[in-house]
Amino acid sequence: MRIIALLVLAVAVSACVKDKSSIDEVVGSDNISGYVSLYDDGVGKVDDSGMTVTVEGATPAVSAVTDAKGYFILPELRYGTYTLVYSKAGYGTYKRHNVDHTVELGGTFITPTPSLGQLAKASVVSASASVVGSEVKLSVSTSPAGSMANTVYLRFFLSKNKEVSSTTYMYHSANYISNMNPFVFTIQKSELESFGYTAGTTVYFRVYADGFWSNDYLNPETGRMVFPNLNLTTPAPGSFVVP
């Protein structure tokens, strides 16, 4: 009986040693690296250097600055899940959440390479709504004016809340290309219904100028998209009633 007990103990000790060994293999560190591709507020390519990539919440702080090729390396980070913050003067701050840093030959390489643009230089100076049949038309003027020689990018936000903004909204549009002034968004009644707005509902809207590259990302805490490159100079919210 004693021999059997000793054998069981030996097996248990052996299992513990194996478990500890596997944990030790995972608890380690390596580099996180990657590239950025930088643009102006349109589609013009610019120098990729000078963007700071920071590990959010790291103590002590961990960051790196991109070189002329847009390359950065964050050395010897312990394995885990991280949020990387990309920032540079003139650019909306971009965040990459849930970077899974695990055992990989050569460390963790960030893919795909983010294309990041500058803050929108244009701004919205007026925005009004009109209902025509089963359509809602949002007429938007910008400064400088959109034209064939000067492309402007626009995005609108909708809500039942009169305080609608780029951070408080129920619906956000795609990024529209404007080569005219004013630019008119046409929203069909069927689209509004698909957004959750029924006939007779008062809907509040707000329009912002954006960059071609929005530097947008999903905020996992709010479940909303964040649009860092919007020019926040814009008129107060307007409204319309769903036809």
Place the predicted regions along the sequence by residue:
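Bacterial Sec-dependent N-terminal signal peptides
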Residues: 1-40
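Extracellular beta-sheet/turn segments enriched in Thr/Pro/Gly and aliphatic residues
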Residues: 22, 102-126, 239-243
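Short, ordered, surface-exposed loop/turn motifs in non-cytosolic proteins
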Residues: 30-32, 39-58, 149-152
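Solvent-exposed loop/turn segments flanking beta-strands in beta-repeat/beta-sandwich domains
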Residues: 43-49, 145-169
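Short, acidic Ser/Thr/Gly-rich low-complexity loop/linker segments typical of extracellular
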Residues: 58-71
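A short, solvent-exposed beta-strand micro-motif common in secreted/extracellular proteins
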Residues: 70, 80-96, 208
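Structured interaction patches on ligand/partner-binding surfaces of diverse proteins
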Residues: 89-113, 213-232
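Beta-strand-rich modules
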Residues: 192-219
